[in-house]
A protein has these predicted regions:
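Short, solvent-exposed, mixed-charge loop/turn linkers that connect secondary-structure elements
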Residues: 67-70, 87-89, 93, 107-161, ...
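Outer-membrane beta-barrel proteins
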Residues: 90, 203-207, 303
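Short, conserved phosphate-binding/catalytic loop or strand-edge motifs used
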Residues: 3, 27, 75, 89, ...
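Amphipathic alpha-helical coiled-coil segments
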Residues: 40, 44-67, 74-81, 97-100, ...
Length: 311
């Protein structure tokens, strides 16, 4: 009976770049995951900011609706007095009443919109279900006091779009699938390994680790499948198809990036025009209300005209 103890090791030589390409592929996949996480974080931050400012805008709409309701209720009170005195017809009185109910419905509609915006913002902020159901979101500063957004300088290079996380993520996937082609092609070639063994051999357990009991060996081995029925070839074609699909996704991502830029620039330009027109409208209505108030103070018109102007 012989007793032996041995330690063996094997090292596969990466002649064909199989493991190098596999490492590159995994690294690019990891970078894609990191950049995709960054894109998701930016998306959530953007949605949160948009939801917050939308909530502030809805607050202003609700406040305006409440002021309109009070004004129309005051006007309706005057219409009611004049109707009882026979100064106006029932048709005018019913129209005034309808305006009150229209304003009241607008208040309720704006209240629902504000509540929905609060719940959406609470979800984006990761609040608990109890907070989502009951808490009122803090508003912070007045939206009308916010500084104007900075003006984008003209002539910005389109290369800036390469910094977008979604574009970078798509690019990393192309690189990963390209490296995967190298992994698949390496299967066409044999695997070459260095092997070695170091141990002891003895007929006695006592002499197993002493005396002339040492034994060692080394060598080079190679292996590859003789018949794979085209599996490796199809794997290469599949890897190439995945790369082409990744290129198509990258092109689509770049197209969407340019579309977003165009939409944003157009929206900003038209928003500036809308703000200017709205400000001119507000100035005209404010001046009309001042004139109506001045005429009423001097006895040239009745208070109903003032309420209509303030409405």
């Amino acid at each position: 009976m012989n007793y032996q103890g041995q330690l063996s090791a094997s090292w596969e030589l990466d002649f064909w770049g199989k493991y190098r390409n596999n490492y590159t592929m995994l690294s690019d996949v990891l970078l894609n995951t990191v950049v995709s996480h960054e894109a998701l974080r930016l998306s959530v931050a953007s949605q949160t900011a948009q939801s917050y400012f939308a909530l502030l805008a809805l607050d202003m709409q609700l406040a305006t609706a409440k002021r309109t309701l009070r004004t129309r209720e005051d006007a309706f009170g005057i219409y009611t007095s004049r109707y009882r005195q026979g100064d106006i017809t029932e048709l005018d009185w019913q129209r005034a009443r309808a305006e009150v109910e229209t304003a009241r419905a607008q208040v309720h509609s704006s209240t629902v919109a504000v509540d929905s915006a609060e719940a959406s913002l609470a979800v984006l902020l990761g609040r608990s279900p109890r907070d989502i159901m009951s808490a009122v979101m803090p508003r912070g500063g007045d939206i009308s006091k916010l500084p104007a957004p900075p003006v984008l300088p003209a002539g910005l290079p389109s290369e800036l779009l390469e910094r977008r996380p979604d574009v970078r993520a798509a690019e990393y996937m192309i690189m990963a699938y390209n490296a995967n082609i190298g992994v698949a092609r390496a299967e066409f070639f044999p695997s070459i390994s260095l092997t070695g063994m170091l141990g002891t051999l003895s007929a006695s357990v006592v002499n197993l680790f002493s005396g002339p009991a040492g034994a060692w060996s080394y060598g080079v081995t190679g292996s590859m499948p003789l018949l794979d029925f085209g599996r490796t070839w199809y794997n290469v074609k599949d890897a190439e198809a995945q790369k082409e699909a990744a290129i198509a996704v990258y092109r689509k991502t770049v197209q969407n990036a340019f579309k977003d830029v165009r939409t944003s620039l157009t929206s900003q330009r038209e928003a500036d025009a809308i703000v200017a027109a709205s400000q001119a409208q507000v100035d005209s209505l404010r001046r009309a209300a001042e004139i109506a108030r001045l005429q009423y103070d001097n006895g040239y018109t009745d208070y109903l005209t003032v309420l209509d102007a303030e409405r």
